[in-house]
Regions:
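Alpha/beta catalytic barrel-like cores
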Residues: 1-155, 161-172, 176
Length: 181
């Protein structure tokens, strides 16, 4: 005997194949309503391919260089990066990663969507962040991951601090994405 089931809560992982933040909040917010306890911005634009938008940032770092072997990451086709010649692990540092900037902009769109009634009151704004290991593993040689990842982790911690400073905790949900593309 078949039974029907209507979910009471729906969780969206992050990426949503719509045209932009306003379309995500409008379409998904209206369709799922109160079943959504949190809603991501859909990771539009340069974030559409998950961590790929971090590659230019890493590639432009003076602490990294393309691996001399010419090896490519099979899944992305990007040249793998390694420590630049003469660079020690404790010298590596990264500046702004862009996640806090993107979150703050999307949060303003979230507020507008909630004010319009597209997103139900009480729904939190979900910020999806990759683990530092996911980013570094995706673009760096295995031999240098352990040397590079701590610096990226520090930069990501600063991003989280900025997100938490600019988005009220009562509106915020942070999801750590643990996977490799």
């Amino acid at each position: 005997m078949a039974t029907s089931y209507t979910p009471t809560h729906v969780h969206l992982v992050g990426s949503i194949g719509l045209g932009g933040v306003d379309e995500v909040f409008g379409t998904v917010g209206r369709a799922l309503g109160r079943r959504l306890k949190r809603i991501p911005d859909g990771e539009p634009g340069p974030r559409r391919l998950w961590v790929s938008f971090q590659y230019p940032l890493l590639r432009s770092s003076p602490f990294l260089r393309p691996d001399p072997s010419g090896a490519l990451r099979k899944t992305s086709g990007f040249p793998l990066l390694c420590l630049a010649e003469g660079v020690k692990a404790d010298e590596v540092e990264f500046g702004e990663l862009g996640y806090a900037r993107e979150a703050r902009g999307s949060y303003l769109d979230f507020l507008a969507a909630r004010d319009r009634g597209d997103v139900a009151k009480g729904t939190r704004f979900q910020v999806c962040l990759p683990t530092p290991m996911s980013v570094i593993y995706a673009f760096c040689t295995a031999r240098d991951v352990a040397a590079i990842e701590p610096a990226y982790e520090k930069a990501m911690a600063r991003e989280v601090e900025l997100i938490c400073r600019h988005i009220p905790h009562s509106d915020l949900c942070i999801q750590w994405d643990v996977c490799h593309d």
